[in-house]
């Protein structure tokens, strides 16, 4: 199913979405921790970001700080996986999540049409995920196997 955004969301003045400058893994870990998410060894996280198909950050022109982050991996045929969705807690957290989801889904739709999308995300993002068309599964992904 293709994604079409209902309305264009706007960041507060001075904030922007960046997809060209790789964020410092230390800063991503700080953001993940603030969201109550698991953090990762710096070297492993840095490699994961570099090997991702793409990523987006939300930053401020005046402050050297991350306000949001998401990265995507995909086989470009069947699956697109959204990882490390995180947004700084506060008044704009829901807006940051929604903007990250909007730009991510637009890019997946454009570059990876037909891929099913799986998301690894914190509880604080659930409202934004639902508002962007995701169906939350309270039981999560279940492993399937076939015994030979």
Regions found by a protein language model. Give the residues of each.
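A conserved beta-strand-loop-helix scaffold within acyl/acetyltransferase catalytic domains
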Residues: 38-62, 66-86
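Conserved acetyl-CoA-binding loop-helix of GNAT-fold acetyltransferases
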Residues: 93-107
């Amino acid at each position: 199913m293709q994604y079409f955004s209902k309305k264009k969301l706007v960041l507060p003045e001075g904030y922007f979405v960046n997809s060209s400058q790789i964020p410092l893994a230390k800063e991503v870990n700080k953001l993940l921790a603030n969201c109550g998410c698991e953090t990762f060894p710096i070297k492993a996280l840095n490699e994961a970001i570099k090997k991702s198909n793409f990523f987006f950050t939300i930053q401020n022109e005046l402050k050297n700080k991350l306000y949001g982050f998401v990265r995507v991996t995909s086989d470009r045929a069947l699956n697109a996986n959204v990882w490390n969705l995180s947004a700084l807690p506060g008044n704009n957290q829901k807006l940051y999540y929604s903007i990250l989801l909007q730009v991510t889904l637009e890019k997946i739709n454009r570059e990876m049409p037909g891929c099913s999308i799986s998301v690894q995300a914190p509880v604080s993002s659930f409202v934004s995920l639902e508002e962007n068309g995701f169906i939350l599964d309270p039981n999560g992904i279940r492993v399937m196997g076939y015994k030979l």
